[in-house]
């Protein structure tokens, strides 16, 4: 006999959500968003978003197109600064320091918070020079140091075995999936603390997607990862926590398993069961 979730007057679904709230409360916070709004000119795109991104976990942002998930992701390393008329109100604290404070070194911030985009964007250089690009910008040119960085970054991106004999060939000769893993290697070569992935698999075939998903799982032992995805199955597979956004607002944020199986908000349930989106 199926038991009612309100057995003996106890709301079991609420108990489950309380348990996951406790789990989140125990996590070390990498990125704290105490209240963030964002405007493009007069148009408001984000409305008082409040959340804590846990350290060395994978957090996924889901929601329909235009809901603000990529906009929010890009606030974490101030990529929105490059958009004319963009204005942010509020704060984002990276390990306790507000990245929007006056005098923030944005170049250093973007080293600490690396970003991988939807479409693989290798530079028209050799595989080797792609990986060391950020290191050379930092003034690191010692061959031994660069050689070591290339090997560990490519190993870290699960690409070394496929390219170790062609490091001095053009990166443009790689497949789409290999190019995306190369971009991840280039990003981790400068030793960031956070990786932002903006739909990193949307341009890839299923086999390449699986390799990138496996890589994300491996990388979270060293990095805090935030991924935007249109693919709810992908969010369920790779993330520890999921945030559902709708029309610029954070509707629900919590443990991925709980959010997908026992959402607190009807709006979340409607989205994940395909009623809209």
Swiss-Prot record:
Gene3D superfamilies per the UniProt record, alphabetical: P-loop containing nucleotide triphosphate hydrolases
GO MF: ATP binding; ATP hydrolysis activity; ATPase-coupled phosphate ion transmembrane transporter activity
Predominant localisation class: membrane
Pfam families noted in UniProt: ABC_tran (PF00005)
Leading EC class: translocase
Subcellular location: Cell inner membrane
Gene Ontology CC annotation, any one: plasma membrane
Catalyzed chemical reaction(s): phosphate(out) + ATP + H2O = ADP + 2 phosphate(in) + H(+)
Top-level lineage group: Bacteria
Membrane topology recorded in Swiss-Prot or TrEMBL: Peripheral membrane protein
A Gene Ontology BP annotation from the UniProt entry: phosphate ion transmembrane transport
UniProt entry tagged with the keyword Zinc-finger: no
Residues the entry annotates as binding ATP: 63-70
Residue span(s) of domain ABC transporter: 31-272
Coiled-coil residues: none
Task performed by this protein: Part of the ABC transporter complex PstSACB involved in phosphate import. Responsible for energy coupling to the transport system.
Family affiliation: Belongs to the ABC transporter superfamily. Phosphate importer (TC 3.A.1.7) family.
NCBIfam families the record matches: 3a0107s01c2 (TIGR00972)
Protein name: Phosphate import ATP-binding protein PstB 2
Lineage, uppermost ranks: Bacteria, Pseudomonadati, Pseudomonadota, Gammaproteobacteria, Pseudomonadales
């Amino acid at each position: 006999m199926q038991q009612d979730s309100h057995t003996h007057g106890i709301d079991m679904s609420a108990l489950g959500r309380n348990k996951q709230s406790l789990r989140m409360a125990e996590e070390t916070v990498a990125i704290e968003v105490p209240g963030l709004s964002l405007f493009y000119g007069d148009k408001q795109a984000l409305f008082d978003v409040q959340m804590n991104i846990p350290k060395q976990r994978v957090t996924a942002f889901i929601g329909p197109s235009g809901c603000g998930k990529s906009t929010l992701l890009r606030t974490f390393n101030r990529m929105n600064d490059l958009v004319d008329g963009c204005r942010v109100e509020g704060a984002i604290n990276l390990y306790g320091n507000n990245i929007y404070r006056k005098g923030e070194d944005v170049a250093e911030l973007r080293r600490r918070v690396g970003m991988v985009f939807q479409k693989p964007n290798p530079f028209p250089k050799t595989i080797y020079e792609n990986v060391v690009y950020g290191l050379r910008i930092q003034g690191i040119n010692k061959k031994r140091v660069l050689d070591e960085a290339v090997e560990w970054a490519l190993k870290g991106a699960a690409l070394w075995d496929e390219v170790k004999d062609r490091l001095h060939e053009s990166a443009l000769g790689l497949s789409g999936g290999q190019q995306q893993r190369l971009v991840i290697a280039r990003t981790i070569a400068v030793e960031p603390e956070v990786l932002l992935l903006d739909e990193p698999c949307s341009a890839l075939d299923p086999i390449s997607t699986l390799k990138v998903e496996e890589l994300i799982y491996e990388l979270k032992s060293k990095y805090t990862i935030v991924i935007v995805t249109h693919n709810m199955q992908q969010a369920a597979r790779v993330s520890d926590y999921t945030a559902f956004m709708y029309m610029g607002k954070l509707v629900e944020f919590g443990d991925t398993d709980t959010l997908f199986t026992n959402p607190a908000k009807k709006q979340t349930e409607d989205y994940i069961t395909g009623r809209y989106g």
